[in-house]
């Protein structure tokens, strides 16, 4: 009798494992070359408390993973390839196409990559900044261009900014071209659209389209004049036919372009940040960076996480990313030490520019540092930059 019961328990356990197992199939493409398949990319599926599953993409860019766990919103997919930025995305991810971004060399560059599901067939990326509107009908703007345009599901659509200009605002939005005349459509909200933002060799932000919202335009984020991200992440309606150029488009986007607070899990963010500090202390810089970014995903106003992230980036030699993190620290500075924090961050950015030989940019940021706080170090740096003109 006991033997029969034991056999039954083993059978049920085996059935449970099979039932919870899940097969995940994805495709990996280049973010900058249309339809280029990426082979030999390492694809990792992770979930807390479970053993990671790893696969490699084949010549067609396809990768299949058999997960011994249920793949849900608590699961992470990570794609790694030499010469490309790591891609990190929350699941569900089965049947999706992901595009990896080649490492960028510009200190002031940025790449924005859009992917989505099978429907709608055509989503379009739009980048709007003073005097410029980069999209499918106008693929090149000042220091920015549409690298890849996709009209038959999945994406990617990629916009690269070669040089962000301090003092100018940039708005990035996604238009549901397939349902462009249907302001009450739910198709965009149900598209599984995701936006990935890259600086240097790192993915620094990611966004998922809000669910159960009607509209044909997803206004994702704004880069403010200081170069800081302002999360908008709102779905609404817009008539892009009225936008003949970049000067007209803000009028079209006006109902949706006000930055909103993005809710997150503050307690989880603090926990992830502590884990990141521990990893940093052990010298595990890659893991620390991942944890600090995860903390920021949970709380986009977490200043300490950005400060820690900047240190990790600098230690790893990720200079462009260090600039981005310092800009965010400037934006979040508050309290009695705010001026000191801003001055220090401007100085850090200036030193990076000076070391790269970008002396006019360095001078501008040394002057910004001095505008926040008097310091003979800043005075001498300004003299040094003026002598190089």
Predicted regions and their residues:
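Canonical tetratricopeptide repeat
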Residues: 274, 308, 341, 348, ...
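A short, solvent-exposed loop/turn motif at the edges and junctions
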Residues: 50, 70-92
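Intrinsic-disorder/low-complexity signal
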Residues: 101-263
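Short, acidic Ser/Thr/Gly-rich low-complexity loop/linker segments typical of extracellular
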Residues: 49-65, 150-151
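Structural motif
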Residues: 22-42, 115-119
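Alpha-helical segment of the N-proximal tetratricopeptide repeat
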Residues: 261-298
């Amino acid at each position: 009798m006991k033997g029969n019961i034991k056999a039954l328990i083993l059978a049920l356990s085996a059935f449970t494992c099979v039932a919870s197992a899940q097969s995940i199939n994805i495709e990996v493409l280049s973010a900058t070359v249309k339809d280029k398949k990426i082979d030999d990319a390492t694809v990792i599926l992770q979930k807390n408390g479970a053993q990671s599953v790893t696969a490699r993409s084949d010549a067609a860019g396809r990768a299949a993973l058999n997960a011994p766990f249920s793949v849900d919103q608590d699961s992470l997919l990570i794609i790694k390839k030499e010469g490309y930025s790591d891609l990190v995305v929350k699941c569900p991810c089965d049947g999706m196409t992901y595009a990896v971004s080649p490492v960028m060399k510009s200190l002031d560059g940025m790449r924005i990559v859009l992917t989505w599901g099978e429907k709608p067939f055509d989503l379009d990326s739009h980048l709007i900044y003073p005097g410029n509107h980069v999209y499918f009908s106008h693929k090149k703007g000042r220091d920015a261009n549409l690298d890849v345009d996709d009209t038959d599901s999945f994406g990617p659509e990629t916009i690269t900014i070669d040089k962000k200009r301090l003092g100018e605002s940039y708005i990035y939005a996604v238009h549901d071209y397939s349902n462009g005349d249907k302001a009450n459509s739910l198709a965009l909200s149900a598209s599984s659209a995701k936006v990935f933002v890259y600086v240097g060799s790192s993915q620094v932000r990611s966004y998922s389209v809000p669910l159960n919202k009607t509209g044909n335009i997803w206004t994702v984020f704004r880069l403010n004049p200081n170069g800081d991200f302002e999360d908008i992440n709102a779905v609404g309606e817009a008539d892009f036919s009225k936008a003949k150029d970049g000067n007209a488009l803000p009028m079209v986007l006006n109902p949706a372009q006000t930055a909103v607070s993005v809710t997150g899990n503050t307690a989880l963010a603090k926990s992830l940040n502590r884990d990141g500090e521990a990893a940093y202390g052990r010298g595990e810089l890659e893991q620390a960076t991942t944890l600090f970014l995860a903390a920021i995903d949970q709380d986009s106003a977490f200043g300490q996480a950005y400060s820690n992230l900047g240190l990790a980036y600098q230690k790893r030699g990720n200079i462009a990313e260090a600039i981005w993190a310092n800009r965010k620290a400037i934006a979040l500075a508050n309290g009695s030490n705010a001026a000191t924090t801003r001055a220090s961050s401007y100085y850090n950015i200036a030193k990076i520019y000076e070391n790269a030989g970008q002396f006019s940019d360095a001078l501008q940021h040394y002057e910004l540092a001095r505008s926040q706080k008097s310091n003979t170090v800043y005075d001498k740096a300004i003299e040094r930059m003026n002598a190089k003109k």
